[in-house]
Each structure stands twice: as C-alpha cells, then as structure tokens.
Swiss-Prot record:
InterPro entries: Glyco_hydro_43 (IPR006710), Glyco_hydro_beta-prop_sf (IPR023296), Glycosyl_Hydrlase_43_Enz (IPR052176). GO terms for molecular function: alpha-L-arabinofuranosidase activity; xylan 1,4-beta-xylosidase activity. The gene is xylA. This is Xylosidase/arabinosidase. PANTHER family: ENDO-1,4-BETA-XYLANASE (PTHR43772), PUTATIVE (AFU_ORTHOLOGUE AFUA_2G04480)-RELATED (PTHR43772:SF2). Coiled coil: none annotated. The record marks 144 as: Important for catalytic activity, responsible for pKa modulation of the active site Glu and correct orientation of both the proton donor and substrate.
Length: 473
C-alpha cells in the first residue's frame, strides 16, 4: 500500500527551499538550497538531494550530500553559504550544477556523471577573455542561477532586484557555449525590475529574484519571485532570451489572490520569499515552492501542488493545500500530523512570517519541531494563542462522528472545529495544561463530502498541536 502524500512532500524535519525539480531516468530529483532548523541565516547547510519514482511521489529517497560549501575554491573555510542552485544535463551527458556563494558576484559550476552523485567543482562562468561574469566593470552581480541546455547552447538566467533599486534593471539571460562556462552571448534583460517596469505589463509583479526556466512545446516559461516575494509568477516567450510577456501568478505562499474560499487579499499563511519551478511528471504538471516555518525566514520547507497548463499556455493560480501531489482528497479517517497545515493565522492578520525582524519570532503561531537540526523529530504547530487557526485541505469525509487532538502546553480553553475558516463551529474540544502530548476528544459529527478542516484555539495561554484524528466509530 502506498504512503499518503502530503505537503511538505519531504519529511517534516527536512528544510529544502528553492526547489528545482527534474525528471531523469524515471525519477524526480529535487535540487535546492538547504536551510538549517533554528538557523540564523539562509542556506547554512550543504546541498543534499532527494528523489522519488515518477509513479510514486510518496516514496522520497534521501540521496545524501551532493556538494559541500567547502568544495568551491573561493570558500575553503566554509564561511560563505551555498545559495539556490540549478542543474542541467550538458551536451556531453554529464550533469552540471550552477550556484552562487552568498558573498561573491560570480556563478560557480560543479559537475557529476550521475544526477545525485558527488559533484566536483568545475569552474566559473566567464567571458572569452577569462574574466568571470559578474566581475567585469559594468556587470551586475550574479544571483540565483537557472539553466536550460539546448544542443550546444546553455541559457543562464540570473538576477536580484529589490524593489526601488535603480541600479538593477531586471532578470538577465546569458548564453554559454558547449564547455558550459564560456559566455557566447552577453547578458540581456528579459523581465524588468520595479523601477523600469512602466508600460511593460509586469507592473505590480516585477522581477525580484528566484529565476527558473522551463520549456513546454515551443514556449519558454520563465518562473520568478516578484517584488512582493510571496508569489511565484511566470512569463512566456517563443525565444529564450527575448520577448517575455507577463503571464500571472502560479502560487503564493500565503495564498494571496485566491478567492475560491476567502477574500482574495486575505493571507491564510505567514508568507515570505518564494522560489521554485514547474515540472511535468507522468503527464501531469506541478509547481514546487516553499513555505516558512519556525517563525523565521531561515527554516523553509518544500511544498508542491498540481497545476494545469491550459490550451492557450496560461497557468491558473492554485491554492496551497495539505494534499500536495495527491490525486484525491485525503481520506476522512485516521490520524494526521498538524505540520501538514496549509493555512495558519490568527486574529492579527499578516502577509509575512515576521514583521519585527526578530529571529524565530513568537508573534504568530508557527510550525516547528523539537530537537536540533538533523534530528528526525516530527513537526507540530506551536504558539497557538487565542484565535490561532490551523487549516487543512482537503478531506473526503464520510461518517465522521468524533475528533481527537493531541495537545500540550500552558493552555486552558477549547479547540473549535469547522469546515471553513469563518464557518459554523461544528463542535468544541476542551483542552487544559499538560507538559506532555495529551489526547483530548469530543463528539463532533462532520458532514459527509469534501471539506477543509479548521481548528481554532479559544482560551488562555499557548497551546501546541501535534495531530488530529478523525473517527468514524
């Protein structure tokens, strides 16, 4: 029997944001940066890889460390972090890993004979005279490399353009030769930054960071994070280095713009920067993105949703869900971990994870874990104060008669159970102080049908929620 698919799609103790998904030899491989649980900055860990068979996206396999930050000659002491990478299959049949260290403006390249083996440093992207791209006078710093190889040419997309920064004009496309390093066509701007977007069609969704590139048929899809950070947008063109037109938002990691179950501009999760891409797996298309956990921007986790590319090439925005890649709603019975919440909010509304700039902010409810980074401890929701709500989507409910929850913390109150974020309270589960995980339950019939489930804490103190169980007897 296959395992159930959830979001996040990897174990709850793994933190891989900025995912670039690829299918090689019947498996889906995930290349991303690697955050640290309780980390104080982005991308503190070495690159690791996970993969799954294309016909079973519940069976993710840890491939191990594929590249260490100290493998780059510019970083022998490891003081610089490995930022978001990308991988492409070169014309020689080898796999090339492109990345940027966090304190230099150049693109590094590593190579491997297999998708998830030990990559070895290969060189730096450079002009024909040997000058490294990003270091020539007039160059903009390179950031977040994305790559696509067609024949003997590799298209490299880079850029970082904070809102209001007139020194950066937009996302860049550079063409490399068959050695995978040498520039054969110099950088050109393909999507504008905010100061240069007037009349472009990108207004309000200008390029910020996180470029990614895919091709479907004869159409190039440029995926990127806009200046509002939480959304992954796309632009399309029939040419890899020009003519890109704004397409829309594919996903927001706070579910902004979605109006199918709430007001369009109401945030339903604590968002932040976003980075990911699209991929076709067994004839279906998916968007990979990341969410923020632990009350910080430095412990991000990968999520995925199924998308549709319509006949005209457009991609409608999708909701964040708990189902992830699952083809059907989750079964409306049994125990589910709280860390699969796709909605998390409280009475104090916020688009972003942390408005204070604090490390591991406790202003809002948050998904976290016990232990230290690398400990295989299951995630849970902490800091659920009065009005804190966790939402889970979607369940195929049939004959549910009661609901159990596992809670701990200095709390006294009730958890309200609903099938919509602002809907009728179907029942209440009383909870009280416990310093260990304790199960509480109540008779709460849930109507048959496909529903979301929302748990809202009402009371004093602060509760942590580990799981809930849907009971049919």
């Amino acid at each position: 029997m296959r395992k159930q698919r959830f979001n996040p799609y990897l174990p709850s103790w793994e933190y891989i944001p900025d995912a670039e998904p690829y299918v090689f030899n019947g498996r889906v491989y995930i290349y991303g940066s690697h955050d640290r649980f309780n980390g104080h900055a982005f991308c503190l860990n070495d690159y690791v890889c996970w993969s799954a068979p294309v016909d079973d996206l519940s069976e993710w396999r840890y491939e191990g460390v594929i590249y260490r930050k100290t493998d780059d000659p510019l970083n022998p002491d490891g003081r610089m972090c490995l930022y978001a990478p990308d991988v492409t299959l070169g014309p020689d049949g080898r796999y090339y890993l492109y990345y940027v260290l966090d304190k230099v403006p150049v693109v590094s390249v590593a190579v491997c004979d297999t998708p998830a083996g030990k990559y070895e440093f290969y060189g730096y992207v450079r002009y024909a005279d040997g000058t490294r791209l990003g270091e020539r006078e007039g160059d903009w710093p390179q950031f977040d490399p994305a790559v696509l190889t067609e024949g003997e040419r590799t298209y490299l997309y880079t850029g970082f353009c904070p809102k209001g920064d007139k020194s950066r004009k937009g996302a860049m496309a550079t063409v490399l030769g068959p050695d995978m390093l040498t520039v054969v066509e110099e950088p050109v701007i393909i999507v504008p930054s905010e100061p240069y977007s007037r009349g472009s069609g990108f207004e309000g969704h200008e390029f910020f960071e996180a470029p990614s590139i895919r091709k479907k048929g004869d159409t190039y899809y440029f995926i990127y994070s806009s200046v509002v950070m939480h959304e992954l947008c796309y632009a399309t063109s029939k040419h890899p280095t020009k003519g890109f037109k704004y397409g829309g938002v594919i996903v927001s990691n706070c579910d902004l713009h979605i109006d199918s179950y709430k007001p369009a501009e109401k945030p339903m999760y604590y968002g932040g920067n976003n980075h990911g891409s699209i991929v076709e797996i067994n004839g279906e298309w998916y968007i990979f993105y990341h969410r923020h956990t632990n009350g910080t921007s430095f412990s991000r986790q990968g999520c995925m949703e199924k998308i549709k590319i319509l006949e005209d090439g457009s991609i409608p925005q999708v909701e964040m869900t708990s189902c992830g890649s699952a083809d059907e709603p989750l079964p409306g019975r049994g125990e589910y971990p709280a860390y699969i919440a796709c909605n998390l909010f409280c009475g104090e509304e916020s688009v972003y994870t942390d408005l204070t700039g604090a490390w591991m902010n406790n202003q809002f409810p948050k998904i976290t874990q016990d232990g230290k980074d690398g400990d295989e401890e299951p995630g849970y929701i902490a800091n659920m104060k009065d009005s804190a709500t966790a939402g889970f989507k979607y369940f195929d409910c049939k004959g549910i008669k009661s609901v159990k929850i596992k809670v701990r913390g200095y709390c006294r109150g009730v958890f309200e159970v609903k099938t919509s974020w602002n809907g009728e309270v179907l029942g209440k589960i009383p909870v009280e102080f416990s310093n260990i995980w304790t199960e509480f339950s109540a008779s709460i019939p849930i109507p048959d049908g496909i529903h979301a489930l929302y748990f809202t804490y009402r009371g004093s103190g602060s509760a942590s929620l580990k799981s809930f169980t849907l009971c049919t007897d």
